[in-house]
Protein backbone atom coordinates (compact mmCIF):
# COMPACT_ATOMS: atom_id res chain seq x y z
CA UNK A 1 0.00 0.00 0.00
CA UNK A 2 2.89 2.35 0.74
CA UNK A 3 4.33 1.93 -2.77
CA UNK A 4 0.92 2.67 -4.27
CA UNK A 5 0.65 5.88 -2.21
CA UNK A 6 4.09 7.03 -3.27
CA UNK A 7 3.29 6.33 -6.93
CA UNK A 8 0.04 8.33 -6.71
CA UNK A 9 1.75 11.26 -4.98
CA UNK A 10 4.48 11.29 -7.62
CA UNK A 11 1.94 11.15 -10.45
CA UNK A 12 -0.07 14.03 -8.98
CA UNK A 13 3.08 16.10 -8.53
CA UNK A 14 4.01 15.60 -12.19
CA UNK A 15 0.46 16.40 -13.36
CA UNK A 16 0.19 19.59 -11.27
CA UNK A 17 3.67 20.69 -12.27
CA UNK A 18 2.94 20.18 -15.97
CA UNK A 19 -0.39 21.99 -15.85
CA UNK A 20 1.06 25.03 -14.07
CA UNK A 21 3.74 25.46 -16.75
CA UNK A 22 1.38 25.09 -19.72
CA UNK A 23 -0.46 28.45 -19.35
CA UNK A 24 2.80 30.41 -19.27
CA UNK A 25 3.97 28.73 -22.45
CA UNK A 26 0.65 29.47 -24.17
CA UNK A 27 1.00 33.24 -23.78
CA UNK A 28 2.45 35.00 -26.85
CA UNK A 29 5.59 37.06 -26.46
CA UNK A 30 5.05 40.74 -27.27
CA UNK A 31 8.33 41.94 -28.76
CA UNK A 32 7.01 45.09 -30.49
CA UNK A 33 7.73 48.42 -28.88
CA UNK A 34 4.94 50.99 -28.64
CA UNK A 35 5.09 53.74 -31.24
CA UNK A 36 5.79 57.13 -29.68
CA UNK A 37 3.95 59.97 -31.39
CA UNK A 38 5.81 63.26 -31.01
CA UNK A 39 3.04 65.35 -32.58
CA UNK A 40 0.90 65.38 -29.43
CA UNK A 41 1.05 68.43 -27.18
CA UNK A 42 0.05 68.45 -23.53
CA UNK A 43 -2.67 71.03 -22.93
CA UNK A 44 -3.35 72.35 -19.44
CA UNK A 45 -6.55 73.91 -18.32
CA UNK A 46 -5.72 77.23 -16.70
CA UNK A 47 -9.17 78.00 -15.36
CA UNK A 48 -9.26 79.05 -11.77
CA UNK A 49 -11.35 77.03 -9.32
CA UNK A 50 -14.41 78.62 -7.68
CA UNK A 51 -13.70 81.16 -4.99
CA UNK A 52 -14.18 79.09 -1.82
CA UNK A 53 -13.30 75.72 -3.32
CA UNK A 54 -11.08 73.56 -1.10
CA UNK A 55 -10.98 70.45 -3.27
CA UNK A 56 -13.94 68.69 -1.64
CA UNK A 57 -17.68 68.73 -2.12
CA UNK A 58 -19.45 71.07 0.28
CA UNK A 59 -21.27 69.54 3.24
CA UNK A 60 -25.01 69.50 2.58
CA UNK A 61 -26.87 68.34 5.68
CA UNK A 62 -30.03 66.34 5.10
CA UNK A 63 -28.99 64.89 1.75
CA UNK A 64 -27.65 61.39 1.36
CA UNK A 65 -25.77 61.16 -1.93
CA UNK A 66 -28.02 63.83 -3.39
CA UNK A 67 -31.28 62.16 -2.30
CA UNK A 68 -33.71 64.83 -1.14
CA UNK A 69 -36.50 62.53 0.03
CA UNK A 70 -40.04 62.16 -1.19
CA UNK A 71 -42.07 64.99 -2.60
CA UNK A 72 -45.15 64.13 -0.54
CA UNK A 73 -45.65 62.65 2.92
CA UNK A 74 -45.80 58.85 3.06
CA UNK A 75 -47.46 56.87 5.84
CA UNK A 76 -44.91 55.22 8.10
CA UNK A 77 -42.15 57.66 7.13
CA UNK A 78 -40.54 59.59 9.96
CA UNK A 79 -38.33 62.58 9.39
CA UNK A 80 -34.70 62.62 10.47
CA UNK A 81 -34.17 58.89 10.29
CA UNK A 82 -32.10 56.90 7.81
CA UNK A 83 -34.15 57.98 4.79
CA UNK A 84 -35.93 54.70 4.20
CA UNK A 85 -39.61 53.95 4.57
CA UNK A 86 -40.40 50.93 6.73
CA UNK A 87 -44.10 50.23 7.15
CA UNK A 88 -45.02 48.26 10.24
CA UNK A 89 -46.83 45.65 8.12
CA UNK A 90 -43.51 44.49 6.63
CA UNK A 91 -42.17 43.61 10.07
CA UNK A 92 -45.45 41.96 11.02
CA UNK A 93 -45.49 39.85 7.84
CA UNK A 94 -41.89 38.80 8.44
CA UNK A 95 -42.69 37.74 12.00
CA UNK A 96 -45.74 35.73 10.89
CA UNK A 97 -43.91 33.99 8.05
CA UNK A 98 -40.89 33.29 10.26
CA UNK A 99 -43.11 31.79 12.93
CA UNK A 100 -44.91 29.58 10.42
CA UNK A 101 -41.65 28.34 8.91
CA UNK A 102 -40.08 27.53 12.27
CA UNK A 103 -43.00 25.35 13.40
CA UNK A 104 -42.22 21.62 13.46
CA UNK A 105 -44.14 19.46 11.02
CA UNK A 106 -47.09 17.60 12.49
CA UNK A 107 -46.55 13.89 13.04
CA UNK A 108 -49.49 11.75 11.99
CA UNK A 109 -49.71 8.27 13.42
CA UNK A 110 -51.10 5.59 11.19
CA UNK A 111 -54.34 4.14 12.53
CA UNK A 112 -53.84 0.75 14.13
CA UNK A 113 -55.64 -1.95 12.18
CA UNK A 114 -56.89 -5.05 13.91
CA UNK A 115 -55.27 -8.41 13.14
CA UNK A 116 -58.57 -9.67 11.72
CA UNK A 117 -58.71 -6.75 9.26
CA UNK A 118 -55.09 -7.29 8.12
CA UNK A 119 -55.64 -11.05 7.72
CA UNK A 120 -58.86 -10.46 5.74
CA UNK A 121 -57.08 -8.03 3.35
CA UNK A 122 -54.11 -10.44 2.90
CA UNK A 123 -56.54 -13.24 2.03
CA UNK A 124 -58.52 -11.05 -0.38
CA UNK A 125 -55.69 -9.25 -2.24
CA UNK A 126 -52.27 -10.65 -3.23
CA UNK A 127 -50.74 -7.16 -3.47
CA UNK A 128 -51.93 -5.99 -0.01
CA UNK A 129 -49.41 -3.93 2.00
CA UNK A 130 -50.13 -3.67 5.71
CA UNK A 131 -47.77 -0.70 6.25
CA UNK A 132 -50.14 1.69 4.47
CA UNK A 133 -53.28 -0.52 4.24
CA UNK A 134 -53.39 -0.48 0.41
CA UNK A 135 -53.55 -2.97 -2.43
CA UNK A 136 -52.70 -2.69 -6.13
CA UNK A 137 -55.69 -3.38 -8.42
CA UNK A 138 -55.22 -4.52 -12.02
CA UNK A 139 -56.12 -1.06 -13.29
CA UNK A 140 -55.24 2.26 -11.68
CA UNK A 141 -53.31 3.40 -8.63
CA UNK A 142 -53.16 1.72 -5.23
CA UNK A 143 -56.38 1.67 -3.24
CA UNK A 144 -57.18 1.42 0.43
CA UNK A 145 -58.47 -1.86 1.75
CA UNK A 146 -61.84 -1.80 3.52
CA UNK A 147 -62.90 -4.92 5.36
CA UNK A 148 -65.85 -5.86 7.55
CA UNK A 149 -63.37 -5.64 10.46
CA UNK A 150 -62.15 -2.10 9.72
CA UNK A 151 -63.23 0.61 12.13
UniProtKB/Swiss-Prot annotation:
Top-rank lineage group of the source organism: Bacteria
Localization of this protein: Cell membrane
Function: Has immunoglobulin-binding and hemagglutination properties, and can bind to mannose. Essential for virulence. May be involved in LPS biosynthesis or polysaccharide transport.
One CC-aspect GO term: plasma membrane
Record bears the keyword Transmembrane: yes
Protein's recorded name: Lectin-like protein BA14k
Keywords linked to the UniProt accession: Cell membrane, Lectin, Membrane, Signal, Transmembrane, Transmembrane helix, Virulence
Amino acid sequence: MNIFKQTCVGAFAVIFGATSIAPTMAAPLNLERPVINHNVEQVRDHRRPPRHYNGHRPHRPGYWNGHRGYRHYRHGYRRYNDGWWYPLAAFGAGAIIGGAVSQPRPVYRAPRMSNAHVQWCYNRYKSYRSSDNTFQPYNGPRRQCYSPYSR
